[in-house]
Amino acid sequence: MEKLVERFLNYVTFDTKSDPSNQQCPSSPGQITFAEALKLELVALDLVDVSLDDNGYLMAKLPSNVDYPVPAIGFVAHMDTAPDASGANVKPQVIKDYRGGTIELGESGESLSPSQYPDLDSLHGHDLITTDGTTLLGADNKAGIAEIISAIAYLKANPDIKHGDICIGFTPDEEIGRGANLFDVEKFGAEWAYTIDGGPVGELEFENFNATSADVICHGVNVHPGTAKGKMVNSMNIAAQFQLMMPAQETPECTEGYEGFYHLKSAEMGVARSELGYIIRDFEREGVEARKAVMQQKVDELNERLEKGRVELVLTDSYFNMKEMVEPHQHIIELAKQAMIECDVEPMIKPIRGGTDGARLSFMGLPCPNIFTGGYNFHGIHEFITIQGMEQAVKVIVELSQRTATHYQK
């Protein structure tokens, strides 16, 4: 446990921001640099089957220390950080024994205030790790990596704690939706796994959005503005019309819980061609299909109003709700719940309003719910984590490993 924070503060010094514009895997060189450093650490822990492949997938195993059959379980985390904010030159602040009030984030002019982030009100007396207001922190998901490795180190140092084979997997490019693309489930060797990629203490998740990307491409005609009358068709005006046709109350900022949404995430604008990048999210397959149909209907309406072929829609499914793949294996949820309760953590079962590697892995034959890291406000400069939350995550991983072995003892 004593090295947990030290590990984390070291890991966030690696710039591992993934790059959606690069089709290589991993999409950024910093991820390989980080993976190579982690590999050395896993070798130093005397784990077996330590391997780092050319695509940046790092795997290892802690062998069973019991003399009866126990299913191999896995713990998975991702090495990249989100492209939404810089992950370079991260300068964490450690706030000991937080007593309330606003936390200034370095000299950036940014701050964490309870009025904007009410979770702070429940964290009095905790030790917080924040950013300096210029970068994200990288708790998503380097906290998960630090917690997994710290739990494995604890099990190595305490061989009286019984466990079966424990498989470890660290993936690249999760934040850009590719984390599981080249994950070798058979090589990994676990019967089921858990991503350690959740937020506040207690989170246990096995439902996530069905996800589709939707690109709306608007075609115009560019003519010199001085002679444009009756000739120019400005694709930016078409794009603006399309956005105004979308349901205004079905966006991320207007939805919560099990509500789905449309999200205009990017726009590339020009007179001759404009492209709007949307993501569609819904917890039900039927819901996401209905949302696709709504977008197609809006495209058809615009084409009828303007000129056929001015607007086109390209839909790409990204991932699906893991619930249908995890629910038949209720014991893996129950083991995680009981491990949390044993560690004085109240399980908070809630849907993931996003996706994880576990969603894709579940459809690849590796059921994979998600467990908390203790972090908050991922993907931005206001990200922070509590040291106590990280410690509780380590305890849950250790207890879950032990409880699985006990469960299968005859």
Swiss-Prot record:
Keywords per UniProt: Aminopeptidase, Cytoplasm, Hydrolase, Metal-binding, Metalloprotease, Protease, Zinc
Cross-referenced InterPro entries: ArgE/DapE_CS (IPR001261), Bact_exopeptidase_dim_dom (IPR036264), Peptidase_M20 (IPR002933), Peptidase_M20_dimer (IPR011650), Peptidase_M20B (IPR010161)
Top-rank taxon, per record: Bacteria
Compartments in which it is found: Cytoplasm
Pfam families: M20_dimer, Peptidase_M20
GO molecular function: metallopeptidase activity; tripeptide aminopeptidase activity; zinc ion binding
Active site positions, chain numbering: 80, 174 (proton acceptor)
EC nos: 3.4.11.4
Alphabetical list of Gene3D superfamilies matching this protein: 3.30.70.360, Zn peptidases (3.40.630.10)
Cofactor binding comment, as recorded: Binds 2 Zn(2+) ions per subunit.
Keyword Chaperone found: no
Function: Cleaves the N-terminal amino acid of tripeptides.
Protein name: Peptidase T
Origin species: Vibrio atlanticus (strain LGP32) (Vibrio splendidus (strain Mel32))
Lineage, highest ranks first: Bacteria, Pseudomonadati, Pseudomonadota, Gammaproteobacteria, Vibrionales
